[in-house]
Swiss-Prot record:
Annotated disease: Esophageal cancer: A malignancy of the esophagus. The most common types are esophageal squamous cell carcinoma and adenocarcinoma. Cancer of the esophagus remains a devastating disease because it is usually not detected until it has progressed to an advanced incurable stage.
Organism name: Homo sapiens (Human)
Residue ranges crossing the lipid bilayer per the database entry: none
Pfam hit, one: zf-RING_2
Single GO cellular component term: nuclear membrane
Polar residues: bias regions: 199-213, 250-264, 286-297, 314-325, 519-528
Family recorded in the similarity comment: Belongs to the RNF12 family.
Region Disordered, residue ranges: 1-29, 81-107, 121-142, 168-273, 286-345, 499-576
Chief location: nucleus
Protein name per the record: E3 ubiquitin-protein ligase RNF6
PROSITE patterns reported in the protein's UniProt record: ZF_RING_2 (PS50089)
Subcellular location: Nucleus; Cytoplasm; Cell projection, Axon; Nucleus, PML body
C-alpha cells in the first residue's frame, strides 16, 4: 500500500512540471501574438494612404497576430517592385510595350488583364506590334465606385504583314475551328487580350488586339485613317456568322473602340462603318470594347435554328445555316405585325416608332435595366457612282455585350403571374419587339428597318453578381454555362426572326406577314417552353443548370424542316466555346456569376472607392476618445494611441483594416446595422 502510494505521489510530481511547461509555452505564445498584433497595428498606422490601399487591394494585409511586420514590409516591397516594372498600371501613363514577349504567360488571359485594370483603377496602356497599335484605358469614379474599361483598336490597312492572302478560308467548316486555331498560333498579336483565342488581329493607331475571332480584312489600299470606313459598293448577298458568332474561318478583324459615347455615336454615323461593341458593366458602370468588323468575302450563312421544337441547349443554335437576302436589294420590306403572340411566360409584343441609328450602338431596347445585346445589322445599297471598281459593302455583324448587376427587387416577379402570358400590340412602321420574362431571365428580340438598313436586336437580361477579385470562374462552372445558355438562346431567337423575314420576302403575294407571325409565335412558344423547363424559380436553378449541362454535352440529331437549304446543327462543348475563343466575349462573363440561390434581397458590400471615401483619423487617448469608446467591435481589441480608425456616417469607428474588410462584404454598420451609404446607393454599389 505504501509503495503504491509513493508511486502515485511520484507520478503527480512528474506531471506538475509538464503542466507548468505547457502553461508557460501557452503564455509565451500569447505574448508573442500580442507583440505581433502591436507591431501589425503600428505598421498599418505608419502606412500612407497609397501604400495602405495598395496592400489592401492586393489582399496583402493578412491577419493581426498571425503575420509579422517584417513579412508585411516584404509584401509591400514586393508589390512595389512588381508595379515598378509596369509603371503604366499605377500612374496611368502611356506605356509602349511593343517588345513584350509574344508568349508572355502572365498576359495570356483577358480575365487577368481586365482584373489588373480593375485593381489599379485609373490606368492607360498602349502598345504597337507591326501594323498594330492599341490603347487600353481604365477609369474609376471614386464618388460612386463606377469602373469603366475601354479598349481602342485600329488597323493600318496599307500594312498587311499579318494578313492571310487568298479566299480558300471561306470554305473551312466551323468544326475545323480548333485545327485552324492551332495552325495560326504563331501569327497572333502580342496583346494580352488576344492570347488564348483563335483570333488573328491587326491593329493601328491607338488600338489593341482583342479576343475576337478572325474575319477577313477588306483592304483595298485605303489610307490608314479612312480604310475602315469604306463608302463604296453595296451589300454582298448573305451574312456571315453563326447565331451571332463570326465564323472561325473568316480571315481578319478590324477593331475600333471609343472611350466616350459621343465619339462612338459620331463614328457610327459614318457611311459603311463596320462596328461592334462589347460593354462590360461593373458596379453599375459601363465599360466598352468596340469592334469594327469589315469582311472581304463571306460564305452566305443563315442565322437560324433548324429544329421545330427548339432544344434546351442553346449551343445547338450556334452553327450557321444558309441565310439569303438577294431579294432585298431590289425590294425593301416593310412589315408590321399586329397580332398578339400568346405563349407561356410573361410575353409582350408591341410595335414602336423607328429609332435614331445613333441609339442602336448602346441600349437599343425599350428597357432601362442592363442587357446583353446581340445586334446583327444588314446594310443594303447600290454601287456608288464614285466607284470605279465593283467594291461591295459587306454584311455588318455587330455584337454588343452589356452586363450589369441587377438590383435586388427587379426580378421579384418570378411567381405564377410573371409566368402568365401577357401580350400587347401597337402600331408602327417597321419595328417589331418581342419581350419574354421567364425564370428571372428577360429576353427581347427586335427588328428595325430604316433607310435600307435592317437591324436585328436580341437582348438578354441576366441576374448577375460580381465575383470576388481573386476568384476565377472555371469554364465548366454551372453559372458560366447558364450565362452561355442564355446568350445562345437569344442568338437562336435572333436568327429565327431573321429567317422569318427572309422567308416572308420570298413570298410576294402578300402572305408574308402571317408567315412571319407564325415564325414569331413558334419562336416564342418553343423557346419559352424550354425556358420554363429550365426553371421559373431560383430554387431549382442549380438542378436545372445541371440537367441542361448534361443536355448541352449530348449530340442530338436535329429535326430538319421542309427547306433543303437549312443545314444540320453542329453541337459543340460549351467548355470549348470559352477555352478556344469561339465565343471570346464570354471571357468577360468570368467577372460575373449567376445568382444560383434566391438571394436577390441580400445586400452586398461596398466598392473600394466607396470605402475610401469614408473619413479616417488617428486615435488619441484623451477625454473625447475615451467617451466615444476604446474597443474596435470587429476585432474586439482596444484602441491604442496612433491607431488609424475609419468613421462611418453613423459615427461608429473601427480599425481601418477591420472595417474595410467588413465593408467589402457588407454595406451596414456592424454595430447599429444602418446602411453606410443609404439603401439605394448601397444596392447600386
Amino acid at each position: 500500500m505504501n509503495q503504491s502510494r509513493s508511486r502515485s505521489d511520484g507520478g503527480s510530481e512528474e506531471t506538475l512540471p509538464q503542466d507548468h511547461n505547457h502553461h508557460e509555452n501557452e503564455r509565451r505564445w500569447q505574448q508573442e501574438r500580442l507583440h505581433r498584433e502591436e507591431a501589425y497595428y503600428q505598421f498599418i498606422n505608419e502606412l500612407n494612404d497609397e501604400d495602405y490601399r495598395l496592400m489592401r487591394d492586393h489582399n496583402l494585409l493578412g491577419t493581426p497576430g498571425e503575420i509579422t511586420s517584417e513579412e508585411l514590409q516584404q509584401r509591400l516591397d514586393g508589390v512595389k517592385e512588381q508595379l515598378a516594372s509596369q509603371p503604366d498600371l499605377r500612374d496611368g501613363t502611356n506605356y509602349r510595350d511593343s517588345e513584350v514577349p509574344r508568349e508572355s504567360s502572365h498576359e495570356d488571359s483577358l480575365l487577368e488583364w481586365l482584373n489588373t485594370f480593375r485593381r489599379t483603377g485609373n490606368a492607360t496602356r498602349s502598345g504597337q506590334n507591326g501594323n498594330q497599335t492599341w490603347r487600353a484605358v481604365s477609369r474609376t469614379n471614386p464618388n460612386n465606385g463606377e469602373f469603366r474599361f475601354s479598349l481602342e483598336i485600329h488597323v493600318n490597312h496599307e500594312n498587311r504583314g499579318f494578313e492571310i492572302h487568298g479566299e480558300d478560308y471561306t470554305d473551312i467548316p466551323l468544326s475545323d475551328s480548333n485545327r485552324d486555331h492551332t495552325a495560326n498560333r504563331q501569327q497572333r498579336s502580342t496583346s494580352p487580350v488576344a492570347r488564348r483565342t483563335r483570333s488573328q488581329t491587326s491593329v493601328n493607331f491607338n488600338g489593341s488586339s482583342s479576343n475576337i475571332p478572325r474575319t477577313r480584312l477588306a483592304s483595298r489600299g485605303q489610307n490608314p485613317a479612312e480604310g475602315s470606313f469604306s463608302t463604296l459598293g453595296r451589300l454582298r448577298n448573305g451574312i456571315g456568322g453563326a447565331a451571332g458568332i463570326p465564323r472561325a474561318n473568316a480571315s481578319r478583324t478590324n477593331f475600333s473602340s471609343h472611350t466616350n459615347q459621343s465619339g462612338g455615336s459620331e463614328l457610327r454615323q459614318r457611311e459603311g462603318q463596320r462596328f461592334g461593341a462589347a460593354h462590360v458593366w461593373e458596379n453599375g458602370a459601363r465599360s466598352n470594347v468596340t469592334v469594327r468588323n469589315t469582311n472581304q468575302r463571306l460564305e452566305p450563312i443563315r442565322l437560324r435554328s433548324t429544329s421545330n421544337s427548339r432544344s434546351r441547349s442553346p449551343i445547338q443554335r450556334q452553327s450557321g445555316t444558309v441565310y439569303h437576302n438577294s431579294q432585298r436589294e431590289s425590294r425593301p420590306v416593310q412589315q408590321t405585325t399586329r397580332r398578339s403572340v400568346r405563349r407561356r411566360g410573361r410575353t409582350r409584343v408591341f410595335l414602336e416608332q423607328d429609332r435614331e441609328r445613333e441609339r442602336r450602338g448602346t441600349a437599343y431596347t425599350p428597357f432601362s435595366n442592363s442587357r446583353l445585346v446581340s445586334r446583327i445589322t444588314v446594310e443594303e445599297g447600290e454601287e456608288s457612282s464614285r466607284s470605279s471598281t465593283a467594291v461591295r459593302r459587306h454584311p455588318t455583324i455587330t455584337l454588343d455585350l452589356q452586363v450589369r448587376r441587377i438590383r435586388p427587387g427587379e426580378n421579384r416577379d418570378r411567381d405564377s403571374i410573371a409566368n402568365r402570358t401577357r401580350s400587347r400590340v401597337g402600331l408602327a412602321e417597321n419595328t417589331v419587339t418581342i419581350e419574354s420574362n421567364s425564370g428571372g431571365f428577360r429576353r427581347t428580340i427586335s427588328r428595325l428597318e430604316r433607310s435600307g438598313i435592317r437591324t436585328y436586336v436580341s437582348t438578354i437580361t441576366v441576374p448577375l453578381r460580381r465575383i470576388s477579385e481573386n476568384e476565377l470562374v472555371e469554364p465548366s462552372s454551372v453559372a458560366l454555362r447558364s450565362i452561355l445558355r442564355q446568350i445562345m438562346t437569344g442568338f437562336g431567337e435572333l436568327s429565327s426572326l431573321m429567317e422569318a423575314d427572309s422567308e416572308s420576302e420570298l413570298q410576294r403575294n402578300g402572305q408574308h406577314l402571317p408567315d412571319m407571325h407564325s415564325e414569331l409565335s413558334n419562336l416564342g412558344t418553343d423557346n419559352n417552353r424550354s425556358q420554363h423547363r429550365e426553371g421559373s424559380s431560383q430554387d431549382r436553378q442549380a438542378q436545372g443548370d445541371s440537367t441542361e449541362m448534361h443536355g448541352e454535352n449530348e449530340t442530338t440529331q436535329p429535326h430538319t424542316r421542309n427547306s433543303d437549304s437549312r443545314g444540320g446543327r453542329q453541337l459543340r462543348n460549351p467548355n470549348n466555346l470559352v477555352e478556344t475563343g469561339t465565343l471570346p466575349i464570354l471571357r468577360l462573363a468570368h467577372f460575373f456569376l449567376l445568382n444560383e440561390s434566391d438571394d436577390d434581397d441580400r445586400i452586398r458590400g461596398l466598392t473600394k472607392e466607396q470605402i475610401d471615401n469614408l473619413s479616417t483619423r488617428h486615435y488619441e487617448h484623451n477625454s473625447i476618445d475615451s467617451e466615444l469608446g476604446k474597443i474596435c467591435s470587429v476585432c474586439i481589441s482596444d484602441y491604442v494611441t496612433g491607431n488609424k480608425l475609419r468613421q462611418l456616417p453613423c459615427m461608429h469607428e473601427f480599425h481601418i483594416h477591420c472595417i474595410d474588410r467588413w465593408l467589402s462584404e457588407n454595406c451596414t454598420c456592424p454595430i447599429c446595422r444602418q446602411p453606410v451609404l443609404g439603401s439605394n446607393i448601397a444596392n447600386n454599389g
